[in-house]
UniProtKB/Swiss-Prot annotation:
Pathway: Cell wall biogenesis; peptidoglycan biosynthesis. It catalyses: [GlcNAc-(1->4)-Mur2Ac(oyl-L-Ala-gamma-D-Glu-L-Lys-D-Ala-D-Ala)](n)-di-trans,octa-cis-undecaprenyl diphosphate + beta-D-GlcNAc-(1->4)-Mur2Ac(oyl-L-Ala-gamma-D-Glu-L-Lys-D-Ala-D-Ala)-di-trans,octa-cis-undecaprenyl diphosphate = [GlcNAc-(1->4)-Mur2Ac(oyl-L-Ala-gamma-D-Glu-L-Lys-D-Ala-D-Ala)](n+1)-di-trans,octa-cis-undecaprenyl diphosphate + di-trans,octa-cis-undecaprenyl diphosphate + H(+). The chain crosses the membrane at residues 27-47, 70-90, 97-117, 127-147, 160-180, 186-206, 208-228, 295-315, 329-349, 360-380. GO terms for molecular function: lipid-linked peptidoglycan transporter activity; peptidoglycan glycosyltransferase activity. Belongs to the SEDS family. FtsW subfamily. The keyword Membrane applies. It comes from Dichelobacter nodosus (strain VCS1703A). This is Probable peptidoglycan glycosyltransferase FtsW. It is a multi-pass membrane protein. It is found in: Cell inner membrane. Its EC number is 2.4.99.28. Keywords: Cell cycle, Cell division, Cell inner membrane, Cell membrane, Cell shape, Cell wall biogenesis/degradation, Glycosyltransferase, Membrane, Peptidoglycan synthesis, Transferase, Transmembrane, Transmembrane helix.
Length: 397
């Protein structure tokens, strides 16, 4: 066995290689890192601008939310570094444990003194310094487990329904937990991403269509089972008819887009953020981006998010070429997750989709979302670094 093949085999078996860890990994994808940095800069600027009025109303310091957002970015960077250094084998081997931890967290939101209720939803755990939104952790946990599960059952996916049903049963358990919180947006993202990962793992399109036919009635029932969801559905079709009731938020979001025009009214000059548009610094921050930077600024943000998703799929493709199936599926899953969540958030703010409480990745204010998105991107960077290392040893790059 040649020295090159020997090193490659030891790497795949997660054995020690004489070089230091940082020396045996390739530098992560530059496009991924640049998009990551760009979204952080945009998020910092836009949260600073969009939160000024909210801070004043809540009698907080002018830059209260901006300072906290900066702390979230710094703290998340530390956890992202740790996530990067752990390596992909850690996530594959601990997938069940991570999934169990996420499910436990979803149960603890009902525990008195620990669970936090906000606007009637039980989504947060009180950890003292921060309220952790467990759903953000659960999304990543489900996708890590799905990648490990599909890798383990690779040979059976083409001819057996059993592994598919097993995965859907786990997904259904988490979907039920999100239904009870309630958090319909996260439920949609998880179910759609798992189905996407099944497709990318090689499950035939006919099986997926059959699953879609079976799942669709359940999703429709969830959508219409609660009166407030049904009102959201009817409101987004014609928000102006309900502009002083259920359509108030969407109408003011659309006004933001109208005021922004092509080039925007200028940074810090938004009118809608002054208590006209609820959640201006969180779920509806894209509306303020459109108002202050115009269509041009909104398209730039969308382009950065699209490039980020593209790089995730490119990383997954390279990992697949290097026969790293778990890494490949996880990269695809992260790409699907970030793409779907961005699409839904932008769709909601533009009136293309009913209102849902999903953040714009890395831009919206919120520690839990920033933390888990940063960890997910760090895992992507690790997947890319490992795949490039193997490709370099095999002489493929």
């Amino acid at each position: 066995m040649s020295p090159r093949n020997s090193a490659l085999e030891r790497f795949r078996q997660h054995q020690k290689i004489p070089e230091k860890r940082w020396q045996r990994l390739a530098f992560p994808d530059v496009g991924l890192l640049l998009c990551w940095l760009a979204l952080i800069v945009i998020g910092m600027v836009m949260v600073t601008s969009s939160s000024l009025s909210e801070a004043h109303v809540e009698r907080l310091s002018t830059h209260h939310f901006a300072i906290r957002q900066g702390i979230f970015y710094v703290g998340s960077s530390i956890f992202a570094y740790i996530a990067f250094m752990l390596g992909t084998n850690f996530y594959r081997e601990k997938a069940k444990f991570i999934l169990g931890l996420a499910f436990l967290g979803l149960l603890l939101v009902y525990a008195p003194g620990i669970g936090v209720v906000v606007n009637g939803s039980r989504r947060w755990l009180n950890l003292g310094v921060i309220n952790l939104q467990v759903g953000e952790f659960a999304k990543l946990a489900v996708f890590i487990f799905t990648a490990a599960y599909l890798q383990h059952h690779t040979q059976r996916l083409d001819h057996s329904w059993q592994p598919i049903i097993g995965l859907l049963a786990v997904t259904a358990c988490f979907a039920l937990m999100f239904y009870l919180q309630p958090d319909f947006g996260t439920m949609v993202v998880i179910v759609a991403t798992v189905l996407g990962m099944l497709f990318l793992s090689g499950v035939s399109i006919w099986r997926l269509l059959l699953l879609g036919v079976l799942i669709a009635p359940a999703m429709v029932w969830v959508l219409i089972s609660e009166s407030y969801r049904l009102r959201r559905l009817t409101t987004f079709i014609n928000p102006w008819e309900y502009q002083y009731d259920e359509g108030y938020q969407l109408v003011n979001s659309l006004i933001s887009f109208g005021r922004g025009g092509l080039f925007g009214v200028g940074l810090g000059e938004s009118v809608q953020k002054h208590q006209y548009l609820p959640e201006a610094h969180t779920d509806f921050i894209f509306s303020i981006i459109a108002e202050e930077t115009g269509l041009v600024g909104a398209l730039i943000v969308m382009a950065i998010l699209m490039i980020l998703v593209w790089r995730a799929f490119a990383i997954g493709y390279l990992a697949d070429r290097m026969r790293k199936r778990f890494s490949s599926l996880l990269a695809y899953g992260i790409g699907l997750w970030l793409g779907l969540q961005s699409l839904i958030n932008i769709g909601v703010t533009t009136g293309a989709l009913p209102t849902k409480g999903l953040t714009l990745p890395l831009i919206s204010y919120g520690g839990s979302s920033i933390l888990m998105t940063s960890i997910a991107l760090a895992i992507l960077a690790r997947i890319d670094a490992e795949s490039r290392f193997i490709a370099r040893l095999e002489g493929k790059i």
